[in-house]
């Protein structure tokens, strides 16, 4: 008979030795369980929409919306507000696109980005006012029911939903500035950099804030090993995106050459510092455990 300790060791070794394919599958499954699935069709629309491409972009977004909705139901997951909105919005957009004349289609192609972001803002803000923040539907499927109505759980979801609402509003305002004030829907800053940065900040905040709340609670309960993540843990990972932003700035002449180079240098430098700090932390933890 194999003792339980040996079995645990084998299980842990197997977990550490997971194949890249298995790790990729687990990562994909984790994404399916989060709000990113509800936002993915909107990202597809933002990436592919443009003059003469609205029909294709809306069609791809609608197909992805239906796919995620069906997969959720097959996996036994509940219907999500954002998932239903995706199907309704992009289905309606397809119908409207076909019934509009050329002038109407041109207007829609100009303003669809702002319409989409304002719609998302209203959904996020409305869900808060309705006391059912849209992220809570995803979070409830990741924790036991006994925690659903605890102040900490509710506060985390209100704050995270608020962060997404702010990101959608920033993106909408940036797009409006590009279209209505600069009269340039292809402006790299208002059309891409600012809007993408807002979404990335909200996504990183979604990962960072629950850890902060959990660690703060552990500190209050007297756990000497608990450490509350600082602002560096929030902003640090975002530096990864400075490199592609710098490259795109240079490639598309989106600003002074020095600015694009500065983005790349700061991004690479920050990533190097973060990796060095992680290695130092791992070494310290290994010494402490040995």
Give the positions of each predicted feature.
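Membrane-helix boundary/juxtamembrane motif in polytopic membrane proteins
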Residues: 143-166, 187-189, 215-236
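Membrane-water interface of transmembrane alpha-helices
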Residues: 124-142, 160, 204-216
